[in-house]
Amino acid sequence: MSAATAAAAASGIQSTAGAIPMRNEKGELSMQKVKVQRYISGKRPDYARADSSSEESDDDDFIDTRKRLERHKAERHKLELSRQGGSAEGEERAAGEGQEEDDAEVDDPRLRRLRQRPVDMEDMERERRERHRHIHEPEIMESDSEDEEEDEGAQGAIQRGTNKITLASESDTDAELSDTELENRRTKLRSRMLQQQREEEVLQKEDEKQSESSESESSEYEEETESEEDNEPRLKPLFVRKRDRATIQEKEREAQKQKQLEAEAKRAAKERRRATLRMVEESVKKDLEKTKPETNEACIEDVCTDDENDEVEYEAWKLRELKRMKRDREERDNVEREKLDIDRMRNMTEEERRQELRQNPKVVTNKATKGKYKFLQKYYHRGAFYLDEENDVLKRDFAQATLEDHFDKTILPKVMQVKNFGRCGRTKYTHLVDQDTTKFDSPWYAESSSNIKFHNEHAGGMRQQFDKPTGSKRKKME
């Protein structure tokens, strides 16, 4: 609970709506009403000054546009009645209406300022000009005789534009002034415009005279321009970066153009060289076509057969043909014999097939001795082809060391005793014997009768049974 509420409760006040506790001169608390100042758009608050300067009047005060127009209409109506010389009743009625409006508008600060304005028309004109914007007309410092007429036309257009602007600005203030003031203002404007026209005509005549005498006064004109240039205000020096300077940019452009010209010259030289090569090629082709015979048929005279003996060549051909026929027949017989052997071996049982291989082993014509491999030597398999051919190349020892295998790798450290050491294809292991964990002293590997019996009965692949399982056995297994 706040202090104000506690004080109100202590003083016996039951309701505090729209009132606050206040302490009087005697020190007693009492509830006093609070006057709430409502905000009204356009109304001057009580704490603001009633009169303000002419500069702040346009922003501080606000009067409804509709009321201002009605006031101007009433004033104009009163003036019209007075001019027409109406009856006394009309004058009294107009005077009464004007008096009522004046009484109603006495408190308007804008009307008070309007009445207090100076009566002098020149002061009024000066104030009006100060209120409105100023248009700075261009000044022609130097001009040639040819460009003077164009500049005069542009200046006249700007002058007319300024006159229009002043007329438009004056039309806004016409509503606030009486008809007599408006007529006086318009007469002044007309006289000023006439004076401007006369001045323009005088200036045109003077310009024509100056254009005629411009040739004789060229030297004087140059001196005047120099003096004017000296009197001109000096500009502040501005720093320009190196890459933005005109001289650097021009040099870069020249260098770029030079490079382009050199590239174009090289390209043109290449094109000329290609054109000359094409011309030479075409000329050579034309010469060959001229020397070439018209018929494309083969001429037997082109082949020299003076040293040949037809009978000897025929006998050699016959011998080659007989050998070819014999070789083809032997190849066909061998293929048929191999097919018969394959069919016969397929029809044999496993025991018969083993016995047949023991009695008739495969004959290797070019069988080579088995070589000895070094530590970490790369192994190459001989393969199963060309075993029945008599050739010295096929009988060579292919287990000999090559390239890096000539070196003894047993003297290397343990870390380096791997294949492709230091490469992406490096292996972790050296050989299978090194990784073998078989314990030959274990009783599982002892050659006892019980181990041999167990191995023959239960070891995988020891039973030679290759019977195809029947459907009944498969069902039982399922």
From Swiss-Prot:
Membrane-crossing segments per the record: none
Basic and acidic residues composition bias: residue spans: 107-128, 197-212, 245-268
InterPro entries: MFAP1 (IPR033194), MFAP1_C (IPR009730)
UniProt keywords, alphabetically: mRNA processing, mRNA splicing, Nucleus, Spliceosome
Low complexity bias (residue ranges): 1-20
Region (Interaction with Prp38) residue spans: 229-478
Annotated compartments: Nucleus
UniProt feature, compositional bias: Polar residues: 160-170
Region entry Disordered, spans: 1-276, 456-478
Nucleus is among the record's keywords: yes
Keyword check for ATP-binding: no
Any GO CC annotation of this UniProt entry: U2-type spliceosomal complex
Any GO BP: mRNA splicing, via spliceosome
Compositional bias (Acidic residues): 53-62, 140-153, 171-181, 214-231
Pfam families: MFAP1
Entry similarity comment: Belongs to the MFAP1 family.
The protein's role, per its UniProt record: Required for pre-mRNA splicing.
Subunit structure: Component of the spliceosome B complex. Interacts (via C-terminus) with Prp38.
Protein name per the record: Microfibrillar-associated protein 1
Organism of provenance: Drosophila melanogaster (Fruit fly)
Gene: Mfap1
